[in-house]
Amino acid sequence: MDWIIAWNPDWIIEIVSPGNPRHDYVLKLNLYNEAGVREYWIVDPAKESVWVYYFEESEFKAEAHSFKDEIKVNIYDDLYIDFSEFID
């Protein structure tokens, strides 16, 4: 599979692919890191979980959250996403 990204977005949010989660958790994570994406979130509605990956220079960081959390977007100073709004 060849991917071409015309520009490097700062932040990408993906909904996990139920049929092929490895694609989101491994392949896309590495692809986006190599492309210069600074923050990548993987949202899994079935597990009500959010994995936050962010890249700072040579460091790679990962955080696990649930839909009960208000999650800070690490690359922006004052931006939070409240996932509790999505729970039935």
Q: Where do the model's predicted regions map?
A:
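C-terminal interaction segment
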Residues: 1-35, 42-88
